[in-house]
């Protein structure tokens, strides 16, 4: 696994950041108005700077591509894959809700300011969504399938699903999967504010407060940036041999759902799509052990949080698992959010611990051993996805 976000870029650093229970959302000016966002740490930003000057071709790459490139290298190294392992039987599927947001807005802004000037010749190839996975595939040396896609905020989980399908079908032996997103631009923040869901508490200790019990309820969504990629393959315990210590988690099952849009953000009060996704994942579980913890999608919006909690109650009844979130730490990272949640899940499985909400919420958690975790994601268009991962044996 490789990651980069406001939390840091190494597993130990990220886990320690979670344990501190501090928000990484900071107030910044956007179009003469302050907004809370979670940017990469300075050390993480330095990594991107080094990547950008590493080769002439990297000079024009968008932040999403550079973040994904770093994460892929880390994931391959952590998995112990060699160049000879990778070959044409290794695939890449990286999702992004919006793709090359930063670069596209910069280039389009330059065009609007002076449309008579010749635009940058590489504008089209450098801003297409497919540029993320193709750049990563070249960087790690695979000749296998490379896929980029957007399923809005469920994007990263669908990348995992695709990887599973390719491997199970026998078309690939291993896959790099995950999501990358860099949405911290003036136009993107303005879009969220137009929906009236962005937090107005940019200077608060916790600008984003998913599932808060405060009254009257308020929407407190905020944006962050980051990427997480994971190395995935199908192996038995015997096949793993001495490399079993490299296994971070086991995919138990997954589910997906879709509902007809009822609102501008395609959310129903009952959370129909999420309930469908969770029920499918629970029905297809490989083991009988119950889900101990659910990492919520909960974006910090009134309707979004309420919808998901209603769906969870309809699926689990009165005996709820632990409910956790990382959006009060790092904000909503759109297409990368579920990948960051998956990273959080794997760290929780490794440490048998989680970060409790630092403010009052509308439910009460009861601590228990954490062996199996469900990750939820939902997005514009009425789609939802759910992944269940388990702690490796031993």
At which residue positions do the language-model features occur?
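Condensing-enzyme catalytic core mediating Claisen C-C bond formation in acyl metabolism
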Residues: 1-3, 11-12, 16-29, 33, ...
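Conserved active-site "lid/cap" helical segment
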Residues: 12-93, 100-101, 273-290, 315
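Conserved small-residue
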Residues: 18, 72, 92, 136, ...
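Conserved catalytic cysteine-centered active-site region
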Residues: 26-66, 99-162, 194-222, 303, ...
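Active-site-proximal alpha-helical scaffold in enzymes
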Residues: 68-78, 129-132, 137-140, 146-181, ...
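Short glycine-aspartate micro-motif
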Residues: 89-93, 172-177, 210, 372-375, ...
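Acyl-CoA/ACP chain-elongation machinery
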Residues: 171-218, 254-269, 296-306, 320-363
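Structural signal for terminal/edge beta-strands and the immediately following C-terminal loop/tail
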Residues: 367-394
